Swiss-Prot record:
SMART domains: NDK. It comes from Bacillus cereus (strain ATCC 14579 / DSM 31 / CCUG 7414 / JCM 2152 / NBRC 15305 / NCIMB 9373 / NCTC 2599 / NRRL B-3711). The active site is at H115. Belongs to the NDK family. It is an enzyme of class 2 (transferase). HAMAP family: NDP_kinase. The gene is ndk. Keywords: ATP-binding, Cytoplasm, Kinase, Magnesium, Metal-binding, Nucleotide metabolism, Nucleotide-binding, Phosphoprotein, Transferase. One of its GO terms (molecular function) is nucleoside diphosphate kinase activity. This is Nucleoside diphosphate kinase.
Length: 148
């Protein structure tokens, strides 16, 4: 089953959106298989944002993601990567549709509440950065037979 990595960023944690975000993905029918509240270190941030290392905003990305706790999650389900991207909304909150997480709660590009993997490959890489294999729980959810 497909997995994706999602992270409530420091602004989303401080604004108390963890429960709202988890509820949206559960109501959609996805299965939470890993989650933790954590402080991102500069080393982890560097790995996570490696593709932006040469860009002028790299330092700002690292500073922000390390500025407070984040809530890291792994979700599982059919089409979860693409569906999660749609549920999050466009990166720029003012362009995100109402009803999406960023459309409802985002204010600026820098503080847009949530990060989500943009492909299966990114999901695999990001899950490996933030979670050890033993931190992911594979279990049967009775609801799945009603969804898939």
């Amino acid at each position: 089953m497909e997995k994706t990595f999602l992270m409530v960023k420091p602004d989303g944690v401080q604004r108390a959106f963890i429960g709202e975000i988890v509820a949206r993905f559960e109501k959609k029918g996805f299965q939470l298989v890993g989650a933790k509240l954590m402080q991102v270190t500069p080393e982890i941030a560097g790995q996570h944002y490696a593709e932006h290392k040469e860009k002028p905003f790299f330092g700002e990305l690292v500073d922000f993601i390390t500025s407070g706790p984040v809530f890291a999650m792994v979700w599982q389900g059919e089409g979860v990567v693409d569906t999660a991207r749609n549920m999050m909304g466009k990166t720029r909150p003012h362009e995100a549709a109402p009803g999406t997480i960023r459309g409802d709660f985002g204010v600026t590009v820098a503080k847009n509440i949530i990060h989500g993997s943009d492909s299966l490959e990114s999901a695999e890489r990001e899950i490996a950065i933030f979670f050890k294999e033993e931190e992911l729980v594979d279990y049967s959810k009775l609801m799945n037979e009603w969804i898939y």
